[in-house]
Amino acid sequence: MKEKITIPFYNDLLFKYFVYDNEDEGCQYILKKIIEEITPIRCKELYVINSELMTHHYREKRSILDVRVKTQEGEYINIEVQSTGLFESLHRRFQYYAFKNIALQIKSGDEYRKLQPVYQIILYHEEDKEYHELIRKFSIMDNKYHDDKGSLIHIYYVFLKEIEKIVKEKGKDHLNELEELCYVIEKGNECDRIKMTRVGQIMKEKYDKFMEDMNLREEAWAYEKAEFDKIAHYVDGEAKGKVEKSKSHVIKFYKMKYPNEDISWLENLTEKQDDEIFDMLLNNEDLEVIKRIIGK
């Protein structure tokens, strides 16, 4: 019997599934909550411009969510929302996208006052290794007065793994709404507080429905395997040109696929056994078959 596959809530495709439907009250609620908890923007109306899930070329292009927002003040702004991989390898790319989006707003000879600010919300499944902040904002700021009101770029980096430290410091019962939201996204379907907030309840309901769709489920899992390969490659250094199947990578991949299973049996295996397990995990082999082959 196949072991149950768990897809993390920050999975690119699943995350878009949570918020893509403009006609769905739950999707609108989650998206509004994400925007208002992470940024100072207060939304009156929301519209997802690229609402198609686009599973036919999903693995070829990241699912960046383009959102048109009408604020409480009546202003219209565009926000890009995305769940993605490593901060160090991608944060300059997102700055480039922001500058490019600004440049495309006007043509030569147009008035510059027509330029509208660009907002990005980017969720990373990692820690903030430099400042250890849950949210880090990037904008063009006045050095003396630390004022970014005139900035055309506002990028919000969310480091989901920082929630672990916050929970240890404050306790789960003292999380604010932003922290609660990040905790649910980070912990996913196995979150022990998933039914304690409306966002968690909606995500749980949508997750169960998502997992019933074989095409969506398989596409999301294929992405997880590909994403792990990229992360492992990055960690080991691009110059090596291949994924090193180290002990830490095997354990990390195993925990990604089987979050509730014991990992102690993986600790004292040989390098050859680690390589065999890694390959079998990539090929979606049954857990019992893996243990039998390894002799556990």
Regions found by a protein language model. Give the residues of each.
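Short, charged alpha-helical interaction segments and adjacent helix-coil junctions
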Residues: 2-6, 77-82, 182-296
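Conserved single-residue anchors adjacent to enzymatic active/cofactor-binding motifs
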Residues: 1-218
